[in-house]
């Protein structure tokens, strides 16, 4: 069995204090969290793409590239890449580059997303 660690890039206020960190601080927290996967024995790191919401991971391959530089074995997966909003060739190139930089650890998981309003933001 393989077990992965996932972040969807949530950026919400603390339910107890109501305080919301800056985006830069939350990005740093996410990177620290994902980088801990390998030393803790997880097999895969998954970063999910989100736009225009309380989730701040618009380009998961950037996060995965950073994690690749900090690790040597953990698999690196998008969960998911919203293919309808991108040029498929560009996504293939991005993940092929990540795959080379990570010595073959990249996985691209694609989907259509769950937010119908997102298509308006991308003029679709």
Each PLM stretch: what is its role?
Residues 77-85:
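The substrate-binding groove and active-site-proximal loops of carbohydrate-active enzymes
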Residues 2-23, 85-124:
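Flexible, glycine-rich active-site loops centered on histidine and acidic residues
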Residues 1-71, 75:
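N-terminal beta1-alpha1-beta2 module of alpha/beta enzyme domains
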Residues 60, 66-70, 76-78, 100-107, ...:
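Amphipathic repeat-derived elements
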Residues 48, 79, 109-111:
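Structural motif
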Residues 51, 81, 113-115:
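Catalytic metal-binding/acid-base residues of hydrolase active sites
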